[in-house]
A protein has these predicted regions:
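N-terminal leader/targeting and accessory segments in enzymes
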Residues: 1-123
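Phosphate-binding loop of NTP-binding sites
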Residues: 119-198
């Protein structure tokens, strides 16, 4: 009889992941890739940095992530750059470098300035999508998108490993973040896109 405790095995698995941040964090971009895809300008740091994962929320930053400082109606991501860097962001993308102080990024994070951070997010998602030679089903319309997406993903999942939009995470940000969840094991993607602008 071999002693087995699933709690111990689970803990060992989690601890082994902490040793290598690249183990479960995608997408992986070099900073040179980020600059080439976005047309951004490197303000601080060096191009030898590797990015593990993309985040637009400073509260969920993981070690090695690239934080993209989006600007919304009620918030400005530039205000959260210090929190993102303190939480382990390897780099930040901003549209106005004058809004962040050198102390906010310290010596560890890279700073890339672009004209439009939302556009940069979409460009990075597009570049990441092109790494996968899988079919993509896009759903849009004025009503019924989420229900149709859920049904289609459920049907396809009977035969394939499916990536699909969670809930109604279907705006420009949500679509990009869904694409960043693509993994080599996925065989098809079902993506929902809202129609709130021309």
């Amino acid at each position: 009889k071999v002693p087995f405790d699933d709690r111990i095995v689970a803990k060992q698995a989690l601890l082994s992941r902490e040793d290598d941040p690249s183990e479960d964090m995608h997408p992986v971009f070099s900073l040179e890739d980020v600059l080439a895809v976005t047309g951004g300008q490197l303000i601080a740091g060096n191009t030898e940095k590797t990015i593990y994962g993309i985040s637009t929320d400073s509260r969920s930053i993981q070690q090695g992530n690239l934080f993209i400082a989006l600007q919304g109606e009620n918030f400005d991501g530039h205000a959260f750059v210090p929190r993102a860097v303190a939480s382990g962001a390897a780099g930040v993308i901003v549209h106005d470098v004058s809004q962040i102080s050198p102390e906010a990024v310290g010596r560890t994070a890279c700073v890339v300035e672009v004209r439009d951070t939302l556009k940069a997010l979409g460009e990075l998602a597009g570049a990441y999508r092109r790494r996968f030679a899988i079919p993509v089903v896009g759903l849009t319309g004025s009503s019924g998108k989420t229900t149709t997406k859920e049904m289609l993903a459920c049907i396809l999942a009977q035969e394939k490993k499916v990536l699909y939009t969670e809930g109604n995470f279907n705006n420009q940000i949500g679509l990009s973040m869904t694409i960043f969840r693509l993994r080599p094991e996925h065989e098809i993607a079902v993506l929902e896109m809202g129609t709130n602008m021309p």
